[in-house]
């Protein structure tokens, strides 16, 4: 249990970096950032895939199709929506919307996967969800009070919608990915991360070319193919690809095999906490008291959720009888 939580913590620390990436290169469209990140990931995965080609051959066609669906929803579409939301609403607000994942995932895990992983009684789960929900509200209120430069309701609202879409994408990814890993305990998490990175390569390459064509027609002054700050953009995409997409996904895959889905869900809060930490470091300011109170409630909620013990899976009970 402890090792699984530590792996989830490390994944959250890595994933938190994605909230500051769009702020470093705000002049780059979200489409270019999303495709650039996963194009870098796919290229990095090529030599690793060659070294692990024996394990990759063990995957069936349906496994590769699952990897493709996962990478489309949990990588490309998710990051495109998130980067767009961050540029429209600011990093803290988008971070807190993504922060609803610790509430969304365990609820759906309890509804969908209780027969396999064991059901966590709603009476045990409710205090954790309430703490997390109040904590998220506190941080969100604090950030809205902080204000946004050049505020535009239409742009802000569209950013909220895009952030909500990214929540749906990642919730589906987390549940479906954990389900595959739990159903395939003989498959190494690194092999599965490599497979997802590989199928990302052709999709992201096509997407990057489409983004360049669109920019060339809509914004002819935009320098192509790597924008006005090519060295910064390429370095940032490679760093995010390695730390967030590779190391983060690997750690999360290990945690997914070690922990029940209903407990794994609340641990997504580590990503939210890391994103807030990095954002305030970038701002070079201390978070306000309400934000700190919200963070404390988030941590308390996670501790309550992790300490709760799921009931025995129904499948095991049937097999034993």
Curated annotation (Swiss-Prot):
Gene expressing this chain: ytfF
Superkingdom in the source lineage: Bacteria
Keywords: Cell inner membrane, Cell membrane, Membrane, Transmembrane, Transmembrane helix
Transmembrane region(s): 5-25, 31-51, 66-86, 93-113, 121-141, 155-175, 195-215, 231-251, 262-282, 286-306
Domain EamA per the UniProt entry, residue ranges: 13-141
Cytoplasmic topology ranges: 1-4, 52-65, 114-120, 176-194, 252-261, 307-321
Protein name (database record): Inner membrane protein YtfF
Annotated localization: Cell inner membrane
Organism: Escherichia coli (strain K12)
């Amino acid at each position: 249990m402890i090792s699984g939580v530590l792996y989830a913590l490390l994944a959250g620390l890595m994933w938190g970096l994605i909230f500051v990436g769009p702020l470093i290169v705000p002049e780059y469209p979200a489409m270019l950032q999303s495709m650039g990140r996963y194009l870098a990931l796919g290229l990095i995965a090529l030599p690793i895939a060659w070294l692990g080609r024996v394990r990759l051959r063990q995957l069936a066609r349906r496994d590769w199709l699952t990897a493709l669906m996962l990478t489309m929803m949990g990588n490309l579409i998710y990051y495109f929506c998130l980067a767009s939301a961050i540029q429209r609403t600011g990093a803290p607000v988008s971070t807190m919307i993504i922060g609803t994942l610790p509430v969304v995932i365990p609820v759906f895990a309890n509804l969908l996967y209780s027969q396999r992983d064991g059901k966590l009684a709603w009476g045990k789960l409710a205090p954790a969800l309430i703490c997390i929900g109040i904590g998220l509200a506190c941080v969100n209120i604090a950030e809205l009070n902080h204000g946004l430069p050049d505020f535009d309701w239409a742009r802000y609202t569209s950013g909220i919608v895009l952030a909500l879409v990214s929540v749906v994408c990642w919730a589906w990814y987390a549940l479906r990915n954990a389900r595959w890993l739990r159903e395939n305990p003989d498959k190494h998490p690194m092999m599965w991360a490599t497979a997802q990175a590989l199928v990302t390569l052709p999709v992201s390459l096509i997407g990057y070319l489409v983004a360049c064509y669109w920019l060339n027609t809509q914004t002819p002054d935009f320098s192509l193919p790597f924008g006005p700050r090519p060295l910064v953009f390429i370095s940032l995409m490679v760093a995010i690809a390695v730390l967030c997409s590779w190391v983060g996904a690997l750690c999360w895959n290990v945690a997914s095999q070690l922990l029940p889905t209903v407990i794994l869900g609340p641990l997504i809060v580590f990503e939210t906490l890391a994103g807030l930490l990095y954002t305030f470091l970038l701002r070079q300011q201390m978070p306000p008291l309400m934000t700190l109170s919200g963070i404390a409630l988030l941590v308390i909620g996670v501790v309550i959720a992790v300490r709760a013990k799921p009931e025995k899976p129904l499948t095991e009970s049937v097999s034993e009888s």
